[in-house]
Amino acid sequence: QFITLSDRKIDQLTSSLQRWEKQKVRVPVYDDPKNKKGYIEWEMRPTYQGQALRVQDMMIMRIINDAAWRVPIYFAVTVSQQNRIGLDNFLDMQGLTFQLKSHRTSPVDTEKMYENLMMDVGPKEWSTNFNHDDFYSSMTESLQSGNSIKNVENEYNQGWSKNYQPGYMFRNLGNESIYFNKQTKRLLQNYRSAYVQLAFTYYVDYQNQLKKKNTSEKKLVELKDKIIRTLHKMGEKIPQKP
């Protein structure tokens, strides 16, 4: 627990608006070699009719301050820019989330994003023949036996694990017996957007490499390959049509 507000103070916050004028907000940073200043600072504008802050904005600031960098803080990619309260210079995209960093950062963490989007977790099939009972029973059996989880091809990183595994499961997306409503289909486009964003970031890096006098041919080939593989994986996991 790191939120230090009492229930009474929370009730007071939710029952009224806090008048606010555009100003700089500063949060201290501890032991970050990438932040020589020892703090992050951003401009916080009024979020309610140009005069006040909404309760959710005050809570975000409170969470950041009270967490004191002991736990990671994330924003979903579906959170609008306005609701990120001006923190964009300290947020990097890692897939379906932005992570708040204790220093200025690039908009996309290509290494983390590539790891999340390109790793295969769960059955490699596009779930056209996914069987719920078989999948969960096999994963449970593997965990109970204490064995490392492997799929039928004897490959790692394919099911439940006691340890963190990067990546997303695209389970049942190709199963025509499963109904997806319009809202779900719209939300699934966030996956495609993540792949496109990653590929575009690699493309920008590729163009920047071309402008250098001593361009590394190996680096160019590597970036081009990543662009192609990223878009190919998007087509495999989130195709335009089943």
Set out the residue ranges of the language-model regions.
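ER/secretory pathway lumenal C-terminal domains and tails of membrane proteins involved
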Residues: 1-242
